[in-house]
């Protein structure tokens, strides 16, 4: 059953009217309602606020990493474990083919349904998850296979066990090692890009965001609680933090924005997957013509430029 956000109520009503008309066999009404639905979708999604985009980034029906992997990869095989502690289900790693290109995909997976969400820790990786990602990245470098990172997490897990096993070290190690990989790498924020939990698999030659995704150092609710002692002011915090894809592109913090279907990725997963696949193919064609040592050097320079400013 589809889920709807507060600002999608008119869309929900028309969807329900279409279902009722189909049950009655009223084809004329269905045709009229579908046209009305297209108009309402266009109207609703034309001028979304930053907070509404945040809601879309967290939409329960939004495609997750495994959805995209299933849609864009052929002959996919999963790689498990960090070879030190355990296999963290919050990080998924697959080797397969994107068209005719061999590729490795490493993604953060939130999970669907109560049991799956709990098993995957709501997409919050433990340090062993990041170490699994790094191990697989090492395999990719060894066999000269490009990597696609799919970022979607509220943040790295802050639990006691995670801290005892070196959460901060695992994130720092990934930043260090991924910045120097001698292979083409692409990272895409497909939903939430939560702080260090996102950065740990976000160091790449190309960093892109889906149109309705967000990327921030802290959640807007956390920001509002700290600055105003009121989590209810998260909408104001979202606007002030500039968390959307367009905001980050205008600041030069990401390379590209990937357009979603007009009605959002959650209502047309196949079209969203095609957009990602096309972007990855185009980017790989560009990156594969650059010497791997130059790629590594360019990646490092891009990192060093982050946060740079000039005094007036």
UniProtKB/Swiss-Prot annotation:
Question: What EC number(s) has UniProt assigned to this enzyme?
Answer: 2.1.3.15
The catalytic activity, as recorded, is: N(6)-carboxybiotinyl-L-lysyl-[protein] + acetyl-CoA = N(6)-biotinyl-L-lysyl-[protein] + malonyl-CoA
Q: Where is the CoA carboxyltransferase C-terminal domain?
A: 36-286
Respond yes or no to whether keyword Transport is given for this record. no
Where is it localised?
Cytoplasm
* A GO molecular-function annotation: carboxyl- or carbamoyltransferase activity
Repressor found in the keyword field: no
List the keywords (alphabetical). ATP-binding, Cytoplasm, Fatty acid biosynthesis, Fatty acid metabolism, Lipid biosynthesis, Lipid metabolism, Nucleotide-binding, Transferase
Which pathway is this protein assigned to? Answer: Lipid metabolism; malonyl-CoA biosynthesis; malonyl-CoA from acetyl-CoA: step 1/1
UniProt-listed GO biological process terms = fatty acid biosynthetic process; malonyl-CoA biosynthetic process
Query: Gene3D superfamilies, per this entry?
Result: 2-enoyl-CoA Hydratase, Chain A, domain 1 (3.90.226.10)
The record ties this protein, via Pfam families, to: ACCA
What are the annotated GO cellular component locations? acetyl-CoA carboxylase complex
The cross-references to PANTHER family, in alphabetical order and at most eight, read:
ACETYL-COENZYME A CARBOXYLASE CARBOXYL TRANSFERASE SUBUNIT ALPHA, ACETYL-COENZYME A CARBOXYLASE CARBOXYL TRANSFERASE SUBUNIT ALPHA, CHLOROPLASTIC
Question: What is the annotated role of this protein in its UniProt record?
Answer: Component of the acetyl coenzyme A carboxylase (ACC) complex. First, biotin carboxylase catalyzes the carboxylation of biotin on its carrier protein (BCCP) and then the CO(2) group is transferred by the carboxyltransferase to acetyl-CoA to form malonyl-CoA.
Q: Could you give the subunit structure recorded for this chain?
A: Acetyl-CoA carboxylase is a heterohexamer composed of biotin carboxyl carrier protein (AccB), biotin carboxylase (AccC) and two subunits each of ACCase subunit alpha (AccA) and ACCase subunit beta (AccD).
Q: What family is it from? A: Belongs to the AccA family.
Know the name of this protein? Acetyl-coenzyme A carboxylase carboxyl transferase subunit alpha
Q: What is the protein's species of origin?
A: Campylobacter jejuni subsp. jejuni serotype O:2 (strain ATCC 700819 / NCTC 11168)
